[in-house]
Amino acid sequence: MPKGEGKVIAQNKKAHHDYFIEETYEAGLVLQGTEIKSIRNGRVNLKDSFAKVEKGEVFLHNMHISPYEQGNRYNHDPLRTRKLLLHRREINKLIGYTKEQGYTLVPLKLYIKNGFAKVELGVAKGKKKYDKREDMKRREAQREIERAFRERQKL
């Protein structure tokens, strides 16, 4: 793998189901030593995690990084709040988005890029139940079209 490309460690598939993703940002993570080792082993869960802007800084909450197996008593807290590294103008944009009604910050995926752990952060707006049903109908219709097309190709 070339040095610049990132290796995806974890994805938040539920985020695309529950939210409309308006915009995405790449952010670095402030981690402890045993956390990065657990991330490299793929022991991360983004399921219920979210980000908040507090006092001009962005923090990631509820991201579960399992304790490192070979770690000793100095192992990290699995659910601790982690600071995200973004440029000031990006943080200001995120502050503007989160001030609007209905927008939240959701981590979409976690990956390693040039040896550093990065999070793809999405500015998201919640879907209503009928939006989810509409998406399911659209996906099912697309599957039917592809299935019919494949059957036609066989003939």
Curated annotation (Swiss-Prot):
One Pfam family per UniProt: SmpB
CDD domains: SmpB (cd09294)
An individual GO BP term: trans-translation
InterPro entries per UniProt: SmpB, SsrA-bd_prot, SsrA-bd_prot_CS
Gene Ontology MF, one: RNA binding
Main location per the UniProt record: cytoplasm
Compartments (UniProt record): Cytoplasm
Keywords for this protein: Cytoplasm, RNA-binding
One GO CC term, this protein: cytosol
Function: Required for rescue of stalled ribosomes mediated by trans-translation. Binds to transfer-messenger RNA (tmRNA), required for stable association of tmRNA with ribosomes. tmRNA and SmpB together mimic tRNA shape, replacing the anticodon stem-loop with SmpB. tmRNA is encoded by the ssrA gene; the 2 termini fold to resemble tRNA(Ala) and it encodes a 'tag peptide', a short internal open reading frame. During trans-translation Ala-aminoacylated tmRNA acts like a tRNA, entering the A-site of stalled ribosomes, displacing the stalled mRNA.
Alphabetized PANTHER family for the sequence: SSRA-BINDING PROTEIN, TMRNA-BINDING COMPONENT OF TRANS-TRANSLATION TAGGING COMPLEX
HAMAP family registered for this protein in UniProt: SmpB
Record-stated family: Belongs to the SmpB family.
Protein known as: SsrA-binding protein
